[in-house]
Curated annotation (Swiss-Prot):
The gene is IWS1. Pfam families: Med26. This is Transcription factor IWS1. Belongs to the IWS1 family. Residues 1-16, 58-71, 81-94 have a biased composition (Basic and acidic residues). The keyword Nucleus applies. It comes from Gibberella zeae (strain ATCC MYA-4620 / CBS 123657 / FGSC 9075 / NRRL 31084 / PH-1) (Wheat head blight fungus). GO terms for biological process: poly(A)+ mRNA export from nucleus. PROSITE patterns: TFIIS_N (PS51319). It comes from the Eukaryota.
Length: 428
């Protein structure tokens, strides 16, 4: 018999009521009653002997209201008492102070006008701007009745219209109405004059036996203007022709020595980041200097690698070649096996000596002997052949014409045939 089925186990699970909970509840009730009795014991009962609730003066007593009289009443303001002060009128929401760009322009006119005139002019400009913005932005249409696809199409159309109407290529100006493009042109013109003067000063210093330091001093300004993204168009403009003076910096000096390594490294790194077009290359002539650095043995290997990479990138647009491997045009030629075999046979016949070749006539043999080139003991050195193919080779292998050619699946068929033969032999 298990403990679950035994009556002893059932008796142990029941809660034991020893009277403690009842005693606790009685104690709590007695405490509450004592608290109430203590509060009432402080009240004097003699005060309430003559109390009559009907005659008592109670302010909160409900009053009977005549509905007909209440309908005739009108809404009026509550009368203020003698000591009550009137309330201040509530102020409306103040506008936030906005600082527009026009303030910078108006600062120049501070000497001519006063503060009041500036403030009135600013308010007028703000009013005109707000009116233009309100007129330019039409009210949005209600698109609740449209389907999600039509809403999406309208949103795309609005985005395209906004992109088309957005003004692009505006003339950049400063706050004081100075044209930035004209300033950049003046900066490049001044820098070109100083670069040319630095090259001439370095040549004169080398002729005098002194170190060439003028281009090194001007190098930070040159690299800074070449690495600025916002002036790339002006630097690469063929009319400005700034790259021609960069070529002067990279050219060897009059004594044949190359410019300093810092000049080569910084300028080549800056040229590698630029997207130079064909017109700029032709007008500046910087490609000739890059070709010189690829063929000369004086530059460092790192400079030579950058020059070779630049030469490959710049020669593609000139030679009308693309860097896309899929669009490459590979030169191929048809191979005539019979013609090649005939040419090989004629070549082998021409290599025979007079004694080995059958001479049909003595006159022809004498003529060939006189016309044969003289061979000395010192043979000429063989010219190195090109390491890559100029014409792509074509494979002439035909797998189906080979002696050991087997079609696809022939091995499986042969194995199946052997299995059937074995089964026939066993059956016999």
């Amino acid at each position: 018999m298990s403990e679950r089925d035994s009556p002893v186990g059932e008796h142990t699970k029941e809660p034991v009521n020893d009277g403690q909970e009842q005693e606790y509840e009685d104690a709590v009730a007695a405490a509450d009653s004592d608290h109430d009795s203590d509060a009432l014991s402080e009240v004097d009962e003699d005060q309430f002997e003559d109390y009559d609730p009907e005659t008592a003066n109670i302010e909160d007593r409900p009053v009977d209201i005549d509905e007909d009289v209440a309908r005739t009443l009108k809404a009026t303001k509550r009368k203020r008492t003698e000591g009550e002060a009137p309330k201040k009128p509530r102020e409306g929401r103040r506008d936030k102070k906005r600082r527009d760009r026009d303030e910078d322009v108006e600062m120049d006119d501070a000497e001519d006008g006063s503060k009041k005139s500036r403030r009135s002019r600013r308010v007028a400009v703000d009013g005109e701007r707000r009116q233009k913005s309100k007129a330019a932005t039409p009210e949005p249409e209600n698109e609740d009745h449209l389907s999600p696809e039509e809403r999406r199409k309208r949103a795309i159309d609005r985005a395209l219209d906004a992109a088309i109407k957005k003004p692009s290529g505006q003339k950049r100006k400063k706050k004081d109405e100075i044209d930035l493009e004209a300033e950049i042109d003046d900066l490049l013109a001044d820098l070109k004059v100083r670069m040319e003067g630095a090259c001439q000063s370095d040549n004169q210093a080398r002729e005098a036996g002194q170190p060439a330091l003028h281009k090194l001093k001007l190098l930070p300004e040159v690299t800074a203007i070449m690495n600025r993204n916002n002036v790339q168009h002006e630097v690469l403009d063929p009319d400005t022709n700034f790259l021609q003076h960069v070529k002067f910096f990279l050219e060897p000096l009059n004594d044949g020595s190359l410019p300093a390594y810092n000049i080569q490294r910084d300028i080549f790194n800056a040229l590698a980041k630029m997207n130079i077009e064909k017109e700029a290359l032709l007008s500046s002539g910087i490609g000739k200097v890059v070709v010189f650095y690829t063929r000369s043995k004086k530059p460092e290997p790192s400079i030579k690698r950058i020059a070779q990479r630049l030469l490959g990138e710049w020669s593609r647009p000139i030679l009308n070649r693309t860097d896309d491997y899929k669009k490459r045009q590979i030169e191929t030629r048809d191979y005539d096996y019979d013609a090649a075999k005939m040419a090989q046979r004629q070549k082998t016949n021409s290599q025979f000596s007079l004694s080995q070749r059958p001479a049909p006539n003595t006159k022809e043999a004498e003529r060939e002997r006189l016309l044969a080139p003289s061979r000395g003991n010192n043979s000429a050195r063989m010219v190195n052949l090109p390491s890559s193919y100029t014409v792509a080779p074509q494979s002439t292998f035909m797998g189906s014409q080979g002696s050991g050619h087997r079609p696809l699946g022939a091995g499986g068929m042969e194995a199946f045939r052997k299995m059937t033969q074995k089964s026939k032999k066993r059956a016999n």
